[in-house]
Structure formats: C-alpha cells, structure tokens
From Swiss-Prot:
It comes from Moloney murine sarcoma virus (strain ts110). Keywords: ATP-binding, Kinase, Nucleotide-binding, Oncogene, Serine/threonine-protein kinase, Transferase. It comes from the Viruses. PANTHER family: SERINE/THREONINE-PROTEIN KINASE TNNI3K-RELATED (PTHR44329), V-MOS MOLONEY MURINE SARCOMA VIRAL ONCO HOMOLOG (PTHR44329:SF285). This is Serine/threonine-protein kinase-transforming protein mos. The gene is V-MOS. One of its GO terms (molecular function) is ATP binding.
Length: 354
C-alpha cells in the first residue's frame, strides 16, 4: 500500500491515542522507539569499555546468578551494532560466546532507556529453546562508562529473520543462510516463534515488539525471540486502573488496540506474529507511506497487508496459510487465536504437507 486516504479532521475523531504518533517518519523495519537491538552494525568497533573494571561480584546462590556479572570473566570481541539506547557486542563470558548489551545513560529519553533496561530483565531466570536467555545483568558499570546497565545474553546467532527475508541475495553469510524460504522452512520458523510465544505467555510475559528483526536464527537453524526492551508482565498491566504505560515497538507490527493506547494482552503478540508470517511468505514490506496515516487506517479502516498475491490464491496450501494469517490479525483481540491454538493449527498444516 503506497498511499492511504484518510478523511480530513472534523469528519470523525481520530481513533488513535495522541501519544501514539511517531515523532518522525521511520522505515517499517525500524522501531518507533530505539529500544531494539540495532539492525545496522558499524564496520569498526570503537573502544568497548572505558575506565576501570568494577569490583568482582560476590558469590551468589545459583538461582540469583543472573543478577550479577563476574567482570573478570568478560572478554569483549567486537561491536555488533549500536543505537540511541546503547550498544551490543559479541563477547565471551566464562569462555562461552555471548552478546552483551550496554544501555546508554545519556540519551534523549533517560526514563525510556531505564524502562528498556529493566524490561529486558523480565525474562531473567527463564530458559526456553526459542527465547534468548539472560545470562547475567548488573547496574554496576566501569567508572567512566556512559552505561546505566549491562546485560549479558545468550548468543543467539549472527543472522536475524529480517536478514533472511530481505537480504538473502546480498548476505555475506554461508549459503545455508542465503537460500530462499520454502513453505516448509517458513512453517518451521513459525513454529519456533509460536513455541517461544507460548512459553512467554505461560509465564505472563508479553513481548510487544515481535518482528523479523527481533528473531535470531542460531547456527542450529533454530529461531530465538530476542530484544525484550518493550516487554511487559501481564500481572502488572492487569493491576493498572488508569491509563497503560507507554509501550514502544514497531508501528507496522502493532495491534490496533496498542495503537489506540489500550492495555496490552497476549493477543497483541499474536497480531505481530501474523504480520511476521506474512513477511516470511511474501518477502515484502508490510506498508509504505506516512506512519501516522498507516496507523490511522489500521485502526479506523482495518488496513492490513495484501493477501491477494498468487502465493495465497494459487493453491489450497496458500489459501490455508492465508486463513491462518487473517485469524492472527483480526481487529479484535478476542477473535485472534491463542499461542496454544496457533501452535496446533500450524502443526496440523505442516502435517498436510507430508
């Protein structure tokens, strides 16, 4: 969709919360706030840590081991990417490959930066094959560092699903990462992601920024959901009587209720998955045009990416895939399937392929 026609002001009030508008035009592959791990990696890494190393963390019980960093065991290798909210590095920790995320202290929105840091820790202590695990974290930083906190995460892989979908012909990665997504591969990755969502929702955690750029693909070809800087705990949201807290994310993947400023539910992640599955299937960008117009049309006119392509209409399998995607991005959250039901439907669909 290149242009969206929206009635002028005065015809009808905007269904969007005023605070949801973006401050500037962004590409659909970029977040509406920069809490996500950066997509673009610089060619050269600068000096990684400044000043002296913080004191070695005291011994902690195993169940609290993630809550402190043994700085003597950190060996930084190179920068993976950087953005307004910080930098991500590849490193080793106790000899094991990891990714280290440092959240900047001096940013345009310090409070949002702090929220992003603590949101990343919503999954601390949790383990699942399709979730990037938090290994350790600390608010202690080197004395001269510009960081308000450091998070050590499982190294989920060098490649994101976004790169596989859009950069296949230009990627310098091995051939195994550059081949096109077959229907079987698309369903395999989809089940990986849904399995991760099912686990998160069982732990009362909402991701709220699910998109291909936040899905890593490991060397074992397993998808892992990453970047929890926009995540929320469900019990916290349910306990709020007033307006919900500000939720970041990516406007192209946000459910209508999120764009309207309503309190999030697990069905918001299901909507985001529907857009992601559409991207895997078509290898196209969801929307183009002014973000605020797209947001308005998604809410007021039920705008969605096109399902008219031959990939959806030329075969029975395509039509079945079309039905799954449509069910995920229904306007009302109650009409969307749960992660459990979606997992069952995807497994049944994969079974029909033989």
């Amino acid at each position: 969709v290149s242009h969206v026609t929206v009635p002028s002001e005065g015809v009808m009030p905007s269904p969007l919360s005023l605070c949801r508008y973006l401050p500037r035009e962004l590409s659909p592959s970029v977040d509406s706030r920069s809490c996500s791990i950066p997509l673009v990696a610089p060619r050269k890494a600068g000096k990684l840590f400044l000043g002296t190393t913080p004191p070695r963390a005291p011994g902690l019980p195993r169940r609290l081991a993630w809550f402190s960093i043994d700085w003597e065991q950190v060996c930084l290798m190179h920068r993976l990417g950087s953005g307004g909210f910080g930098s991500v590095y590849k490193a080793t920790y106790h000899g094991v490959p990891v990714a280290i995320k440092q959240v900047n202290k001096c940013t345009e929105d310090l409070r949002a930066s702090q929220r992003s840091f603590w949101a990343e820790l919503n999954i601390a202590g949790l383990r699942h094959d399709n979730i990037v695990r938090v290994v350790a974290a600390s608010t202690r930083t080197p004395e001269d560092s510009n960081s308000l906190g450091t998070i050590i995460m499982e190294f989920g892989g060098n490649v994101t699903l976004h790169q596989v979908i859009y950069d296949a012909t230009r990627s310098p990665e091995p051939l195994s990462c550059r081949k096109q997504l077959s229907l079987g591969k698309c369903l395999k990755y989809s089940l990986d992601v849904v399995n991760g969502l099912l686990f998160l929702h069982s732990q009362s955690i909402l991701h709220l920024d699910l998109k291909p750029a936040n899905i890593l693909i490991s060397e074992q070809d397993v998808c892992k959901i990453s970047d929890f800087g926009c995540s929320q705990k469900l019990q916290v949201l349910r306990g709020r009587q007033a307006s919900p807290p500000h939720i970041g994310g990516t406007y192209t993947h946000q459910a209508p209720e999120i764009l309207k400023g309503e309190i999030a539910t697990p069905k918001a992640d299901i909507y985001s998955f529907g857009i992601t599955l559409w991207q895997m299937t078509t290898r196209e960008v969801p929307y183009s045009g002014e973000p605020q117009y797209v947001q308005y049309a998604v809410v007021a006119y039920n705008l969605r990416p096109s399902l008219a392509g031959a990939v959806f209409t030329a075969s029975l399998t395509g039509k079945a895939l079309q039905n799954i995607i449509q069910s995920c991005w229904e306007a009302r959250g109650l009409q969307r399937p749960s992660a459990e039901l979606l997992q069952r439907d995807l497994k049944a669909f994969r079974g029909t392929l033989g």
